[in-house]
Amino acid sequence: KNVTVQFGGLFALSDLSFEIIGGEILGLIGPNGAGKTTVFNVLTGVYNATQGDVQFEGKSILKKRPYEIFAKGIARTFQNIRLFSNMTALENAMVARHCRTNTGVMGAIFKTPSQKREEAAIRAKALEALVFMNVDNYADTVAANLPYGSQRRLEIARALASEPKVLLLDEPAAGMNPAESTELMKDIARISKTGIDVLLVEHDMKVVT
């Protein structure tokens, strides 16, 4: 609400207000340099707003760290793909899922029964996310070796593995061919139908509409 982000004398955002209503796909459009990615960075705690407030479930998250906001249920993808390139697709999704675990460091070190059960549950949920985004056939493939379009889908799957309440997609169809973009539109609609609110930044108006 009334968010302003200022870097020196430059206003990246000026008095921006909007609300995500439950169950909707909200599109954020604008030319390059308009501040769309800055909005995502404020929502996820990468940037602090100079003025204004950001609320999630009725509480301010303005001073929260990115990992705290992620754990609360706001996940994102990036305009430039940011996968763990040397890890498999399944391992990428499992990393995101760890925000929902309870086992501590000692359990991980000593491989306690509860830790083993939790790790199995993490693997199952991560694989479920890969299946949802149709990249489960790459589960054991190193992320860097996936086709470009599948890397895009994997990044979304990784975000979904955290069971977000709000999903921020920063130009998810960038670099995709028309057929891939069409399939992605269907997937975004399916994501929304699961009850996840989607905020979408995209230059391709076919994806936004």
Label each residue range with its predicted role.
Residues K1-T209:
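Glycine-rich phosphate-binding loops of nucleotide-dependent enzymes
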